[in-house]
C-alpha cells in the first residue's frame, strides 16, 4: 500500500443502477397525496372553536397515512433488492422533462416510515393546541405529505418542488405558534433554507439538460450519465451547501437553535425527527449516488466537517443554559456522525449513518417532546430556575432519564449501535490512511465523552438541583399524563428494539447501501490511478483535488 494525493481527470466514472421494479399498487403516490388532500378538507370541518373535531380528524388522517406506508413496506418492498421498488412513473410536463416518478429503495424506505410515524405522534403531541387549530393541523398534514414526497420522488426537479413546498408549513408553524422571537426565527429559517435551495435548482437544471436534447431529471437516468469530473465537482459543492444547511453542518447551522428555541413541541418533533434527515438523505441520494467521482474527492471534507459538528456542538451544548438550545446543539452534534458515515466509503459506516438518522429521529423527537411538556408546566426554559421539580414529577423524571440515556448512546439503545457502526466502519476500512483514521476517531471520541457530561448534568440541575422555593410554590407541577406517556412509550419501543436487535432496521436498507458503497469505491480506484495512466492520454486535463492534503487515500500498487 502506498499514499497517493487525490488527483482526478476529466475521464468519468460511469456507474449503473438496477432497473426499477414497478409497483402493483400506487402505495407511494397514495401516501403523499392522501395527507395533502386530507389537509384540504380541514377548513370545512364543522367545529365549535375548541378544535376537538379537527384534532381527531387530523389524527385519523395521520394514522391512515402511517398504515399506508407500512402497507407499502409489507406488500411491495423487498429489502434484499438493491434498486428502486414500488416505482410509479407518469409523464407530467414532457416538454420540460418533468415526470411524476416515485419509488423507494433502502435509502428512502426507512425515512418514509419514520416520517409517517413521527407525524402521527406529533399530531397527538399537538392535542392542547387551541389557537387557530384548523390552520395548525392543516399545516401538519400538508407537511406530512410534503416530507414523504421528498423521500419518495425520483425526479430531481420534482424533488426541488417538494423540498421548497415543504418549507412553507414550517415557516408558518414557527411564525404563528412560536415564542416571543418567532418572527425572527421563522425569517432566519426561510432565508437559510430557501436561499440555499437555489443550488438544488441550478444543479437539477445542469444535470437534467446535460448533453443536450430532451431534458431528463429522473434519478435512474442521471445515475447512468457520464458527467465530467469538473462538472461533478461544481454540482457537488452547490448541493453540499444546500443539504448542509438542512442537516445542518457547522457553520451553516445557526438557524436551527433559533428555530428550536421558538417552536412548540409538535414542531420540535417534526424538525428534529424528520427535517434534519432530509439533508442526510439528500447527501446520500445525490452527492454519493449521482456524483461518485466528486464524492471521492469531497468525502474527506465531509469527515472533517462531521468531527467539527460533533465537537463544536457538544461544547456549545455544554455551555447552554436554555433547555431548548441545549438539546438543539445536541442534535447538531449527533448529526456529525451521519457526515462521517457518509464519507467513510465503508458499508458498515454508511449503514451506521443511515441508522443514526433513524435513531436520532426517534430520540430527538422524544427529547423535544419532553422539553415542550416540561415548559408547559414550569413556563421557563432556564435550567437554574427548575431545581427540585423532580420531587413533584417523578414519572416525568423517569421519562427524561430514559430518553437522555438513549441520546448519550447507552448500550441497548439505538444510538449506541449507530454510533458504534460509524466508528467501526470508518476505522477498520482501509480507504484512508491509518494516521488520518486515528486522528478522526480520537477527535470524534471527545464528543462522545462530552455528551453524557452535559446530558446528565442537565438532568441533575432540572430535577434535583437546588430547590427554588418561590418557583415551586407558584406552579402546579402536574406529573406526566397518559397522553404524554403514550407518546414517549411509542418512541422508546423502536429505540430499544433497534438497540437490542439492529437487524430489524439494517435489513431494510443494507442491500442499497452495499451497492452505493461499491460504486463509490470504483470511483476512488479510477481517481487514484497511477500517474502514468493519466499521462498516457495527453488530451485530458488535470484537476487537482480541493480536499485537504492531510487526508490521503491508500491504494494498492497495480
Swiss-Prot record:
For the keyword Iron, the answer is: no
Subcellular location, in the record's words?
Cellular thylakoid membrane
Q: What class of enzyme is it?
A: translocase
- What domain of life does the native source organism fall in? Bacteria
The terms under GO molecular function for this entry are: NADH dehydrogenase (ubiquinone) activity; ubiquinone binding
A GO biological process of this protein is:
ATP synthesis coupled electron transport
Sorted UniProt keywords: Membrane, NAD, NADP, Plastoquinone, Quinone, Thylakoid, Translocase, Transmembrane, Transmembrane helix
State the EC number(s).
7.1.1.-
Which membrane topology term applies here?
Multi-pass membrane protein
Q: Could you state one GO cellular component term attached to this entry?
A: plasma membrane-derived thylakoid membrane
Q: Which reaction does it catalyse?
A: a plastoquinone + NADH + (n+1) H(+)(in) = a plastoquinol + NAD(+) + n H(+)(out); a plastoquinone + NADPH + (n+1) H(+)(in) = a plastoquinol + NADP(+) + n H(+)(out)
**Which Pfam families is this protein grouped with?**
Proton_antipo_M
| Membrane-crossing residue ranges in chain numbering | 25-45, 56-76, 111-131, 133-153, 157-177, 189-209, 230-250, 264-284, 298-318, 327-347, 353-373, 395-417, 438-458, 485-505
> What is the role of this chain?
NDH-1 shuttles electrons from NAD(P)H, via FMN and iron-sulfur (Fe-S) centers, to quinones in the respiratory chain. The immediate electron acceptor for the enzyme in this species is believed to be plastoquinone. Couples the redox reaction to proton translocation (for every two electrons transferred, four hydrogen ions are translocated across the cytoplasmic membrane), and thus conserves the redox energy in a proton gradient.
* UniProt record similarity statement: Belongs to the complex I subunit 4 family.
State what protein this is by name.
Answer: NAD(P)H-quinone oxidoreductase chain 4
Species of origin reads: Prochlorococcus marinus (strain MIT 9211)
Gene behind this protein: ndhD
Amino acid at each position: 500500500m502506498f499514499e497517493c494525493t487525490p488527483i482526478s481527470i476529466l475521464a468519468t466514472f460511469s456507474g449503473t443502477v438496477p432497473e426499477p421494479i414497478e409497483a402493483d399498487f400506487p402505495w407511494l403516490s397514495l401516501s403523499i397525496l392522501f395527507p395533502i388532500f386530507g389537509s384540504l378538507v380541514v377548513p370545512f370541518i364543522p367545529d365549535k372553536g375548541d378544535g376537538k373535531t379537527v384534532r381527531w380528524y387530523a389524527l385519523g388522517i395521520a394514522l391512515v397515512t402511517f398504515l399506508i406506508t407500512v402497507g407499502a413496506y409489507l406488500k411491495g418492498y423487498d429489502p434484499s433488492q438493491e434498486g428502486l421498488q414500488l416505482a410509479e412513473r407518469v409523464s407530467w410536463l414532457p416538454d420540460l422533462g418533468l415526470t411524476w416518478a416515485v419509488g423507494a429503495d433502502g435509502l428512502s424506505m426507512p425515512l418514509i416510515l419514520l416520517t409517517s410515524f413521527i407525524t402521527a405522534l406529533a399530531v397527538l403531541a399537538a392535542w392542547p393546541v387551541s389557537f387557530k387549530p384548523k390552520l395548525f393541523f392543516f399545516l401538519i398534514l400538508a407537511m406530512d405529505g410534503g416530507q414523504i414526497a421528498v423521500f419518495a420522488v425520483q425526479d430531481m426537479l420534482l424533488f426541488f418542488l417538494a423540498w421548497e413546498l415543504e418549507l412553507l408549513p414550517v415557516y408558518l408553524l414557527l411564525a404563528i405558534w412560536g415564542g416571543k422571537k418567532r418572527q425572527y426565527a421563522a425569517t432566519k429559517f426561510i432565508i437559510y433554507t430557501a436561499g440555499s435551495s437555489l443550488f438544488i435548482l441550478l444543479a437539477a437544471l445542469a444535470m437534467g439538460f446535460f448533453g443536450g436534447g430532451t431534458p431528463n431529471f429522473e434519478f435512474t437516468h442521471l445515475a447512468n450519465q457520464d458527467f465530467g469530473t469538473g462538472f461533478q465537482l461544481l454540482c457537488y459543492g452547490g448541493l453540499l451547501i444546500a443539504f448542509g444547511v438542512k442537516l445542518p453542518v457547522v457553520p451553516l447551522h445557526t438557524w436551527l437553535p433559533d428555530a428550536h428555541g421558538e417552536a412548540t413541541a409538535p414542531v420540535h418533533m417534526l424538525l428534529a425527527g424528520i427535517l434534519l434527515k432530509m439533508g442526510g438523505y439528500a447527501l446520500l441520494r445525490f452527492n454519493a449516488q449521482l456524483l461518485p467521482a466528486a464524492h471521492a474527492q469531497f468525502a474527506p471534507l465531509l469527515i472533517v466537517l462531521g468531527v467539527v459538528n460533533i465537537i463544536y456542538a457538544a461544547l456549545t451544548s455544554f455551555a447552554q443554559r436554555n433547555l431548548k438550545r441545549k438539546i438543539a446543539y445536541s442534535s447538531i452534534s449527533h448529526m456529525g456522525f451521519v457526515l462521517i458515515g457518509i464519507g467513510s466509503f465503508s458499508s458498515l459506516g454508511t449503514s451506521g449513518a443511515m441508522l443514526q438518522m433513524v435513531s436520532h429521529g426517534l430520540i430527538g423527537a422524544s427529547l423535544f417532546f419532553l422539553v415542550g411538556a416540561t415548559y408547559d408546566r414550569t413556563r421557563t426554559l432556564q435550567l437554574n430556575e427548575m431545581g427540585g421539580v423532580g420531587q413533584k414529577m417523578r414519572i416525568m423524571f423517569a421519562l427524561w432519564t430514559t430518553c437522555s440515556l438513549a441520546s448519550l448512546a447507552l448500550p441497548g439503545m439505538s444510538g449506541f449501535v449507530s454510533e458504534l457502526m460509524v466508528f467501526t466502519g470508518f476505522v477498520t476500512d482501509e480507504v484512508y490512511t491509518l494516521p488520518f483514521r486515528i486522528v478522526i476517531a480520537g477527535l470524534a471520541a471527545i464528543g462522545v465523552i462530552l455528551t453524557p457530561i452535559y446530558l446528565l448534568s442537565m438532568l441533575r440541575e432540572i430535577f434535583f438541583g437546588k430547590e427554588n422555593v418561590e418557583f415551586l410554590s407558584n406552579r402546579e407541577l402536574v406529573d406526566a399524563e397518559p397522553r404524554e406517556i403514550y407518546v414517549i412509550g411509542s418512541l422508546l419501543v423502536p429505540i430499544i428494539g433497534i438497540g437490542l436487535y439492529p437487524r430489524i432496521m439494517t435489513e431494510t436498507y443494507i442491500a442499497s447501501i452495499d451497492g452505493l458503497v461499491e460504486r463509490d469505491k470504483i470511483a476512488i480506484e479510477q481517481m487514484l490511478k497511477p500517474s502514468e495512466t493519466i499521462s498516457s492520454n495527453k488530451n485530458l486535463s488535470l484537476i487537482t483535488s480541493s480536499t485537504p492534503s492531510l487526508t490521503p487515500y491508500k491504494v494498492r500498487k497495480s
